[in-house]
């Protein structure tokens, strides 16, 4: 093998290794991304089961059912609602009519299996994603929560 061929071989090998490393990094990044959806987005789009995501909205009035450590409730953007099942301890500020962001996966039957529930921290705060979803659906009332 001549010197020129050897150099070309190492350059090609280096480019292949770099391409493989970039592919691994991109795969890791795409696996760790968590997309945000409103209940209307979930109802109007075909969301694949098992995909990790966040849903934001308000806890629908009269929808919270506690059964031991398992809690079932609905997250709504006033236009549509998504049933959520969560097993664990809820945040102290979790209650009906309050803003919430839940992280988890869609499951068969159209319910959302939450692994984490995040509640807003005071009556004036609305998570950015929830506020944008309410504005998009036309339910935003100048920073105040919509009436259900």
Swiss-Prot record:
It is found in: Cell inner membrane. The keyword Plastid does not apply. GO terms for molecular function: heme binding; metal ion binding. InterPro entries: CcmE (IPR004329), CcmE-like_sf (IPR036127), NA-bd_OB-fold (IPR012340). Residues 29-148 are periplasmic. GO terms for cellular component: plasma membrane. NCBIfam families: PRK13254.1-1 (NF009727), PRK13254.1-3 (NF009729), PRK13254.1-5 (NF009731). Signal peptide: none annotated. The keyword Transmembrane helix applies. It comes from the Bacteria. This is Cytochrome c-type biogenesis protein CcmE. It is a single-pass type II membrane protein. The chain crosses the membrane at residues 8-28. Disulfide bonds: none annotated. GO terms for biological process: cytochrome complex assembly. Heme binds at residues 121, 125. Keywords: Cell inner membrane, Cell membrane, Cytochrome c-type biogenesis, Heme, Iron, Membrane, Metal-binding, Signal-anchor, Transmembrane, Transmembrane helix. Heme chaperone required for the biogenesis of c-type cytochromes. Transiently binds heme delivered by CcmC and transfers the heme to apo-cytochromes in a process facilitated by CcmF and CcmH. Gene3D superfamilies: Nucleic acid-binding proteins. It comes from Paramagnetospirillum magneticum (strain ATCC 700264 / AMB-1). Belongs to the CcmE/CycJ family. Residues 1-7 are cytoplasmic.
């Amino acid at each position: 093998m001549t010197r020129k061929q050897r150099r070309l071989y190492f350059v090609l090998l280096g480019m292949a290794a770099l391409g493989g490393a970039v592919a691994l990094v991109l795969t890791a990044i795409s696996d760790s991304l968590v997309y945000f959806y409103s209940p209307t987005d979930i109802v109007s789009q075909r969301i694949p089961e098992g995909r990790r995501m966040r849903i934001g909205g308000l806890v629908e009035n009269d929808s919270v059912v506690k059964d031991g450590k398992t809690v079932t409730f609905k997250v709504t953007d006033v236009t549509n609602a998504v049933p959520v099942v969560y097993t664990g301890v809820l945040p102290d500020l979790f209650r009906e009519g309050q803003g919430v962001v839940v992280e988890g996966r869609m499951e068969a039957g159209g319910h959302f299996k939450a692994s984490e529930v995040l509640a807003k921290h005071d009556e004036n705060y609305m998570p950015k994603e929830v506020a944008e979803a309410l504005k998009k659906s036309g339910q935003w009332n100048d920073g105040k929560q919509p009436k259900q």
